[in-house]
């Protein structure tokens, strides 16, 4: 299991990596650390990625926080090159989805909820793929939720870019149509 740095404190030091990855006698699971790419996962200053990689992290990410600054993403991809580090980003334009509660569409309108446009994800995927083309390296997109973003990843793979992605389980099982019943289990 790879543990994202959505912890308090954030996994961003050699000591926190050692703590998270320590062997647990009697437990059949091995935990690998994904370290924060920026200090406190706030998107401002880079962590000591080379030291963290030497300490045993398997990837770098700000977890649920999308890295918004294009120049920062460029620097991350360049910095990870010498040791083949993997950058995991959750592609969301936070200004476009601000105050959004569900997918933008008919159900959101009917429920009177602010929707989050699909382009907020696909624009960030496009940006990061362009930066990946420029720098080389490898990137993983976490929690993709739109067909457009998946198609962009598919096309990038065909062009030879080292890109992977995942989808959250609830996004495979449920759609915005399910919210029309006001089922509180779907919050």
Annotate each predicted stretch with a short phrase.
Residues 13-19, 41, 124, 147:
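Short amphipathic alpha-helical surface micro-motifs
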Residues 12-16, 29-30, 80-85:
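Short acidic, glycine/proline-enriched helix-loop-strand junctions
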Residues 22-36:
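A glycine-rich helix N-cap at a beta->alpha junction
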Residues 8-9, 39, 95, 147:
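Surface-exposed, flexible loop/turn segments at secondary-structure boundaries
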Residues 36-42:
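Active-site beta->alpha loop and helix N-cap motifs at the rims of alpha/beta catalytic domains
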Residues 1-9, 32-35, 61, 90, ...:
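Active-site neighborhood of phospho(di)ester-bond hydrolases with catalytic His/Asp-centered motifs
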Residues 1-25:
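Metal-associated gating/positioning segment near the N- to mid-region
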Residues 44-187:
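Histidine/acidic residue-rich metal-binding segments in metalloenzymes
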């Amino acid at each position: 299991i790879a543990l994202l740095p959505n912890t308090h404190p954030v996994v961003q030091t050699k000591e926190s990596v050692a703590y998270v990855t320590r062997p647990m006698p009697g437990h059949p699971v091995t935990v690998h650390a994904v370290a924060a790419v920026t200090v406190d996962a706030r998107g401002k200053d880079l962590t000591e990625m080379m030291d963290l990689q030497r300490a045993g992290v398997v990837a770098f990410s700000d977890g649920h926080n999308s890295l918004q600054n294009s120049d920062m993403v460029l620097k991350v991809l360049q910095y990870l090159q010498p040791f083949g580090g993997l950058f995991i980003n959750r592609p969301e334009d936070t200004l476009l989805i601000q105050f959004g509660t569900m997918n933008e569409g008919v159900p959101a309108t009917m429920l009177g909820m602010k929707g989050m446009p699909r382009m907020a994800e696909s624009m960030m995927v496009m940006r990061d793929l362009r930066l990946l083309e420029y720098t080389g390296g490898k990137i993983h997109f976490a929690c993709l939720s739109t067909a457009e973003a998946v198609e962009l990843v598919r096309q990038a793979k065909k062009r030879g870019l080292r890109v992977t992605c995942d989808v959250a389980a609830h996004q495979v099982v449920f759609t915005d149509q399910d919210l029309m019943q006001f089922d509180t289990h779907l919050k």
